[in-house]
Amino acid sequence: MKEFNCPELASNWLKAGKILLHPTEGLWGIGCIVDSTAINLLSNLKRRNNKKGYIILVPNLEDVRRLFQLKPKYFPTLHNIWPGPVTVIMKTKNNSLSLVSDDNNNVAVRVSDHYHLKNLLTFLGQPMISTSANISGKQNIFDLDDIRNTFNDPNVALFNKPLGKLKKASTIIDIESMQIIRK
């Protein structure tokens, strides 16, 4: 499996429509750019239904403001939880994320505080789709060798940087209702 230690090279791999295993705050992730061919490849690798939503990662709050409809009353909440391991469901501003939004234009988005992931996202310069690096419906995989074996495909590379210390998936909240979807 191809490996990258440099965020710029890893971002170029993604921009070519390929799939990247990457560290997050808590779990190994696997992701791609918002592109129908890349999303189909990712879904096939994970054996995942394309109708199930993906999380979008962006490097900062400015990108969130640019891509999503945000009421000013939500700014304090978002400033308190981001950057960090909290994913927020919110409405997109336009159709730029239509490949990953639900019927109501909602998308799950996170501004990560994982140093290496933030660097990767900055070099990428566009939203990145991410999900846990496991087969859909199966247990999370923490061992990197097991992940490499599970996703051994010429279109998959590894951004080989340390995993965060959280050891679980991110919390997910709905910004409109403030309901916790996943703890």
Positions of predicted regions on the chain:
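Active-site-adjacent structural elements in enzyme catalytic cores
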Residues: 1-183
